[in-house]
Amino acid sequence: MSKNDSIAIIGGGLAGCEAAWQLLNKGHSVTLYEMKPVNFSPAHRSSHLAELVCSNSLRSNIIENAAGTLKEEMRRMNSLIMSAADATSVPAGRALAVDRRAFSKFIEKKLKEFPKLTIIHQEITDIPADGLVIIATGPLTSDSLSQSIAGITGNSYLYFYDAISPVIEADSIDYEKVFRASRYDDDGQGDYLNCSMGKEEYELFWKTLTEGQTVSLRDFEDYKYFEGCLPIEVIAGRGVSTLLFGPMKPVGIVDPKTGKQPYAVIQLRQENREATLFNIVGFQTKLTWTEQRRIFRMIPGLGNAEFARYGSIHRNTFINSPALLEKTLQLKTAEHIFFAGQITGVEGYIESTAMGLMAGLSVSEFHKGKSFLPPPPETAMGALLNHITDTDSKQFQPMNINWGLVSPLPGKVKKRERGERYAHRALESLARWQSETSAEH
């Protein structure tokens, strides 16, 4: 491939714009395809690039928070999106929020300063058969392009809705009130943490759950729920006993404290190899975040639960990245195709941007005939990349950045010091990685 070959990027959202910026700054020619204003998705309204569809907040700006550290890492990697956010920020306390119109205009202006950028406003319906391409079309990828993606990945690896259960930080679980067991497990060394309930406890939980406030549907979301991934509150709404034959069924479980089968059981499944996160099995939900905290903390052992990820069900086109992508974000079966942004299975503005940044750097190295060295897992960026490329593909679901994804700190660390220690280590690791990778070029 000659140096003059233009790299195609499909999608002018946060990830696509960030990938373009990284490539342009390294001297590459880029053709950015954006279907607006010729065609609009059901959620988009503006004709500008990098439109923020939902909130105007990029979440916490505090370095001790994983989201804050991820943003700081991107700043140190010359992120266009972070420069735009800082330049167009509006008062939002400890969060980073932006004037969304000024934000988009800033990004568009900076990109258009590069003579090697070509922007083509048209819908791409088929993935190019040759030439380097980054697919960064986001959660509302058009139907025609989705079909093309399914054609190269396989239908079973492309999803159109999230059905996400809450994830709890392991060190916030009260282990005196839970027990380890799998169904029909005789030796008691099971793979699940179990939270048992008696009849009265269960009925109070069921009543509270059915009365919980749920998130309103967005205009572009029209749910026809699959029976296999119904929201927990919808199952509960079908009758007081339905959960006992579904996510809270007690069959095959024996509580070691009583020697008997509990009336109801909630199971927690390990979410990552480090066992720092646990998933509440089968509890996908449309409850608001406030209600999730209130109601799910009624579960024995979760009275002080800290949520690394809240449950949700929403429109979201994404691929099963662990099954499909290399750590370089290349498709395993077609090395000229890279994926970036939310379609890879990250969740959120900054996470999508981060994967756009990674894709841009990775494509640049590949274009030069070199191998891309990902950031270490101690960094927020590296942890996200690990999540989408090195997770059990059978259990894969989109995730925001949180400290549970990052390699655990050595030794015992006080909770109030944990965020600061994680952040300090992440930024030190990033600096070493930047030094090592720059020395190679």
Swiss-Prot record:
Binding site for FAD: 11-16
Cofactors that this protein relies on: FAD
Pfam family, one: GIDA
InterPro entries: FAD/NAD-bd_sf, MnmG-rel, MnmG_N, TrmFO
Single GO MF annotation: flavin adenine dinucleotide binding
Assigned EC number: 2.1.1.74
Any one biological process term the GO annotation gives: tRNA wobble uridine modification
Key words, A-Z: Cytoplasm, FAD, Flavoprotein, Methyltransferase, NAD, NADP, Transferase, tRNA processing
Record-stated family: Belongs to the MnmG family. TrmFO subfamily.
Protein name per its UniProtKB record: Methylenetetrahydrofolate--tRNA-(uracil-5-)-methyltransferase TrmFO
Biological source species: Syntrophus aciditrophicus (strain SB)
Organism classification: Bacteria, Pseudomonadati, Thermodesulfobacteriota, Syntrophia, Syntrophales
Gene symbol of the encoding locus: trmFO
